[in-house]
Amino acid sequence: MQVKSEGNFNTVAIDKGQVIALAERFEELIRELRRGKLATPEDLTAPAVKDDEPLELPIECDFTVGVISITWENNNVVVNMQAASQEDELLIDDIDFGPDLIVANLKINQVKGFCDRANLVVNAGRPACPFCALPVDPLGHLCPRANGYRR
């Protein structure tokens, strides 16, 4: 995933499950904002930002996302993405600078655009096996729940 601002961009590795969870939480947040009238009607009805462009090159990962937090501040959705180690613990690279962290301040229409693209990308993948939930190749796959029989 890439986060862009004023000509700069950062690329982070993010798990497919994290993308799904982030999109679901964003959609839930928008519903809560609408229900609680916490955002202006103009912000809530603004069309989603459409971004179908490919990722910027070169694609060099800054870090792998571990912890993600979402907050609502001053009509902005603030997303913090922090690096994590293989043990799912926070990384602290340097005492002075702290862990790798990206903070993205997004408008509601940008969040809607993220949800649209996330759903498009996630649903474009291979279908899941109904028995084991692993991805199924066009020629099938060896299903561990079916004792290795091809499905």
Segments (PLM) and residue ranges:
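Short, structured motif recognition centered on aromatic/hydrophobic residues
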Residues: M1-V3, L22, F26, V77-M81, ...
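Short microdomains enriched in Cys/His and/or Lys/Arg
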Residues: Y149-R151
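Mixed-charge, glycine-accented linear interaction segment located at domain edges/termini
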Residues: V12, Q86-G140
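A cross-family "folded-core" feature that marks the main globular domain of proteins
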Residues: M1-K4, A13, K37-L38, D52-P54, ...
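The feature marks the first
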Residues: M1-E32, G36
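Short cysteine/histidine-rich zinc-coordinating motifs and their immediately flanking basic loops
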Residues: G140-N147
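Intrinsic, low-complexity N-terminal interaction/targeting segments
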Residues: T40-L101, N105
